[in-house]
A protein has these predicted regions:
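Interface amphipathic segments
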Residues: 1-190
């Protein structure tokens, strides 16, 4: 059936929180362990990290999520204007993931065709600057034996499409792309 955000059921839920702080709009949560299986079948075997929101902004520090075949790590901080999409809001993100399509299949079964079943995709994303001017961004995507792709760059006036400027450098090593043929319908692209 897949994941339905309107009907989330976690069972069983194993949750260990070191501390919770809440005062007005300020929230801080230190998750020492969280494990669950969602109704779709996706299992999170371990999640840890610190989550916070206060007058200075929002942060995820040392957040690690492990599923049976996947792992995601995130460190993200954003200034107080991030929710209002303020262009001058500071932004820093560092995200690393090794995702196996076996885990993704529980969320969106139709998204993973048989040719992609059991495929590992590694991703590293970094960004620093403000929401309006990303001074430095990087993206690395790879799938062992198939593709290794790197992009880095910067963008200015991101929230103003009429004034937006961006520069990027791309590099890729596409070793075995035969699986793409199975993903394309019978068309001129094939």
């Amino acid at each position: 059936a897949g994941f339905d955000p309107a009907f989330i059921v976690l069972s069983p839920l194993d949750l260990s929180v070191d501390s919770i702080y809440n005062r007005g709009a300020d929230i801080a949560l230190q998750i020492r362990r969280m494990a669950f299986t969602e109704r779709s079948g996706l299992t999170v075997s371990d999640m840890t990290g610190d989550i916070g929101m206060d007058a200075s902004g929002i942060s995820l520090a040392g957040v690690t999520l492990k599923a049976p075949f996947s792992r995601i790590e995130a460190n993200i901080s954003a200034g107080e204007g991030i929710l209002a999409l303020a262009p001058d809001s500071p932004l820093k993100a560092d995200l690393m993931a090794d995702v196996n399509t076996k885990d993704l299949k529980y969320l969106y079964p139709a998204l993973i065709p048989p040719v992609l079943d059991g495929r590992i995709v590694s991703l590293a994303l970094t960004a620093a600057g403000t929401l309006g001017d990303i001074g430095k961004a990087g993206l690395d995507i790879s799938s062992p034996g198939h593709v290794a792709f790197t992009a880095d760059g910067a963008a200015r006036n991101v929230l103003d499409p009429g004034r937006m400027e961006a520069s990027a450098r791309f590099e890729g090593d596409f070793r075995d792309m035969a699986f793409l043929e199975a993903l394309l319908s019978d068309s001129a692209l094939r």
